[in-house]
Amino acid sequence: MKQFVRPEFILLKEGQDKNYGKFSVSPLERGFGITLGNAIRRTLLAATPGASVYAIKIAGATHEFTSIPGIIENVTKIILNIKQLVLRIDTSIYSDDEVVQLKIRSDIQGPVYAGDLELPAGVEVLNQDLLIATISEGGILDLVLYAKNSRGYKTFKDNKNEKNIEPGMITIDSNYSPIIKVAYSVDSAKIGRAIDLEKLELEVTTDGSITAIDAISIASKILVAHLEFFIDLNREISVLEVIGVNQTDDKELDRTVEELDFTQRSLNCLKRAGINTLRELVTKNEDEIGSIRNLGRKSLKEIKDKVASLGLAFRQS
């Protein structure tokens, strides 16, 4: 079997807290950009595990339409607030579906925030400034939240079937997915004489309980685990190497910067910096290129666009 080109995974941009990331995968042979992009996107959204509250218990409340004396918000509003809670439950301490309880009991007049919750070991609240409820004069908030690790989305009706639901507990909708947004795009890429290649770009935003790069890694692991059942149907095929060793055309990398059709200003800056070939250019990181004397933003953009159009990228910092 003719082997496929080995693609390279590159981090293009990352948020300061790492809950956002933009990544590229190239070169891919024609058709694999959409194939991989769509599969990873759907797996990220539907199957990435996370933590969520699925039920609550409030002293004085028997259902979600109750109003509690001394609490400004009714139970419906409190539930809406709780559904915005971002949790991280340590999977090395708690097994799948193991329930943890987050509690608060307060009679102090004023707002109660997520950061006021009493947490068991291995449980973390990431948005501690989230308002849970407001206690007025003479009020008492006695609240227990029931949370666990799982995946997907479950309605309050689904959660009524949980085995540990007891009288007095109010089930709520639970969204276990830590993924807020996934987008992908596919562009053409070129390496040497090969012009029918593709570049996949992925953008992932999470709720902060997992980094964007870890989310992609987990989603990919889930995909591969399911595909292995098909691979193992034939032992001979299961050991077949279908991805080749990365053999970027040396002649392509040895092209001089004069051959890359840069404007004279960009060309002069590169030459003064001792960059004479494409190989020398892509061994620099973007900060090193940007710090070249007299290289302005327009020239930097020109150089970045040229490198990207060749299906290449600068060295990561």
Swiss-Prot record:
InterPro entries: DNA-dir_RNA_pol_insert, DNA-dir_RNA_pol_RpoA/D/Rpb3, DNA-dir_RpoA, RBP11-like, RNAP_asu_C, RNApol_insert_sf. One of its GO terms (biological process) is DNA-templated transcription. Its EC number is 2.7.7.6. Keywords: DNA-directed RNA polymerase, Nucleotidyltransferase, Transcription, Transferase. Residues 249-317 are annotated as: Alpha C-terminal domain (alpha-CTD). GO terms for molecular function: DNA binding; DNA-directed RNA polymerase activity; protein dimerization activity. Residues 1-234 are annotated as: Alpha N-terminal domain (alpha-NTD). Coiled coil: none annotated. It holds the Pfam family RNA_pol_A_bac. It catalyses: RNA(n) + a ribonucleoside 5'-triphosphate = RNA(n+1) + diphosphate. GO terms for cellular component: cytoplasm; DNA-directed RNA polymerase complex. The keyword Cytoplasm does not apply. It comes from the Bacteria. The keyword Transferase applies. DNA-dependent RNA polymerase catalyzes the transcription of DNA into RNA using the four ribonucleoside triphosphates as substrates. Homodimer. The RNAP catalytic core consists of 2 alpha, 1 beta, 1 beta' and 1 omega subunit. When a sigma factor is associated with the core the holoenzyme is formed, which can initiate transcription. Belongs to the RNA polymerase alpha chain family. The N-terminal domain is essential for RNAP assembly and basal transcription, whereas the C-terminal domain is involved in interaction with transcriptional regulators and with upstream promoter elements. HAMAP family: RNApol_bact_RpoA (MF_00059). This is DNA-directed RNA polymerase subunit alpha. It comes from Mycoplasma capricolum subsp. capricolum (strain California kid / ATCC 27343 / NCTC 10154). The gene is rpoA.
